[in-house]
Amino acid sequence: MAPRKRTQNAKSKKNPKAPKLEAFLLDFDDEVHTIVERLKEKTNNLLKDADNLYKTALIKLPMAVRKMNWIEYCNLEKPKSPVDDSKVREEAAQVELAIAGNHTIPKVAAKEAKSSANSEDENMAPLKSTMKKKKASKKAPSTSKKPRTLSISKQGGTIQRTTRKPLITPARSFLDSSIIGATPLITPRFDPRLPKTPALRSALHREKVYSMSVNGSPLSAGGEDIVISVPIGNGECIQLLASEMDSVDLSQLDEKALRSIRNLQNRLTTLCGSSK
């Protein structure tokens, strides 16, 4: 005989969506529970804030009014001897100073400020997103590419001439390199009779001086011989060596040079006399 077929019960079949549904319901219950707890906490905070505001308003009232019950306060008529307004103001000012000393800020005002700031941020966010979308739509690049030759042809067919001067090179001899003229082949000799420049100055006392001859070679003062510079005018001066002083002919010097030598002689005599 052939084996008997197994009969499957519909109740024994497992639905694959059942565990997902159970997990979704558990998550939904947890989320609802957390939302309910937050709402309860907010209600408790609002009740505490209302109680604190009620107490602060009650403290500002005068003592005579605080001792009354609600029935007396509601049926209150103007008394024959009214409370002095100045005393009421003084008590209210003292209470306000005491409250300010504690630096207590009601939570309702802070929460209202936060909620208003959040609402403003939420209102500004969609505006910014729409502005960005508009800008992006305006700056959308065009897919059509134009050849380079067309862009060049649109700039204009006329050729603009540049106003720059051509470069001056040694090969281009027809142009002068300066206003004065071409550079001479031989450098001219230095003329001491040229006008003095603003930077020209006389040597200071005990200052190191490096002189130069008329031929253009520098003169070093490395020897042991004493050198005396005598000015003769027109920016020129003569160097006299102490070793060859006997061979100097003073008649060849002008009056200014002789006057300078006599002045130097007098100064040296006074210097040597004071040293003794």
Curated annotation (Swiss-Prot):
Top-level taxon in the UniProt lineage: Eukaryota
Cell cycle in keyword set: yes
Cellular compartments annotated: Nucleus; Chromosome, Centromere; Cytoplasm, Cytoskeleton, Spindle
Major localization class: nucleus
Alphabetical list of Pfam families matching this protein: Borealin, Nbl1_Borealin_N
Keywords, ordered alphabetically: Cell cycle, Cell division, Centromere, Chromosome, Cytoplasm, Cytoskeleton, Mitosis, Nucleus
Gene3D superfamilies xrefs: 6.10.140.560, 6.10.250.1900
GO cellular component: chromosome passenger complex; chromosome, centromeric region; cytoplasm; nucleus; spindle midzone
Biological process, per Gene Ontology: cell division; heart development; mitotic sister chromatid segregation
Region annotation Disordered: where it falls in the sequence: 111-158
Family assignment from sequence similarity: Belongs to the borealin family.
Function: Component of the chromosomal passenger complex (CPC), a complex that acts as a key regulator of mitosis. The CPC complex has essential functions at the centromere in ensuring correct chromosome alignment and segregation and is required for chromatin-induced microtubule stabilization and spindle assembly.
PANTHER family: AUSTRALIN, ISOFORM A-RELATED, BOREALIN
Subunit structure: Component of the CPC complex.
Protein's UniProt name: Borealin
Organism (species): Danio rerio
Lineage: Eukaryota, Metazoa, Chordata, Craniata, Vertebrata
Gene that produces this protein: cdca8
